[in-house]
């Protein structure tokens, strides 16, 4: 059994799934053939994006275990990895200093699904109205409707990422030239942007995780 368990964020949060959970597959692959793994233990498999990413990565459904349903397991061998980036027990600092290899692995793994035949927005605002985050009540723009009206006048589309498939999100961000949004997990998709894509993030917290993610990917934040 390969354990991909992580902190609580991996249960449902898009960011933590992409940066805390899935990169463990890359780490494990450095020392073992993943085809030899009998089962992969995940924090959760309830979210659509979780199942979609595993389909793309070729993890067979019959080998996927969710810790929400398998609370205790016994195995002849359990394989675990280090956390992909929290290595010094200082998560607040380390989440702002992400290693480039994670973004590069995400690109390598998921940009291959890009279907360039579809016409997509090049300039868009991320609408969080459908967000299931526990922080939604704390993260909001008081005059958001006024902001949306202004952005529409500048030919920005208003897009809810939750309404898209994972493959659509990858394609959308890879095609984008200008992205605006409120601090949230959707900015994890900055890993899929082309260099020089323009980014404006509204945030009320001091955290620089998305700012630094943009910078290591050579985006204009």
Protein language model regions, located:
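The feature primarily captures lumenal catalytic ectodomains
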Residues: 1-221
């Amino acid at each position: 059994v390969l354990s991909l368990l992580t902190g609580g964020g991996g249960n449902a949060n898009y960011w933590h799934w992409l940066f805390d959970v899935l990169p463990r597959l890359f780490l494990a692959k450095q020392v073992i053939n993943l085809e030899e793994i009998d089962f992969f233990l995940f924090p959760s498999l309830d979210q659509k994006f979780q199942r979609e990413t595993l389909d793309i990565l070729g993890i067979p459904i019959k080998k996927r275990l969710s810790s929400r349903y398998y609370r205790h397991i016994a195995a002849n061998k359990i394989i675990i990895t280090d956390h992909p980036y929290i290595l010094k027990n200082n998560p607040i600092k380390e989440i702002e200093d992400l290693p480039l290899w994670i973004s590069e692995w995400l690109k390598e793994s998921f940009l291959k699904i890009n279907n360039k035949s579809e016409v997509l927005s090049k300039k868009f605002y991320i609408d969080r109205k459908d967000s299931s985050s526990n922080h939604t009540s704390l993260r909001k723009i008081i005059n958001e409707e006024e902001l949306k009206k202004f952005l529409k006048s500048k030919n920005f589309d208003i897009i809810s990422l939750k309404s898209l498939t994972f493959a659509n999100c990858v394609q959308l961000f890879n095609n984008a030239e200008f992205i605006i949004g409120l601090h949230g997990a959707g900015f994890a998709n900055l890993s899929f942007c082309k260099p020089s894509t323009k980014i404006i993030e509204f945030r009320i917290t001091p955290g620089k995780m998305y700012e630094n993610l943009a910078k290591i990917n050579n985006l204009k934040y």
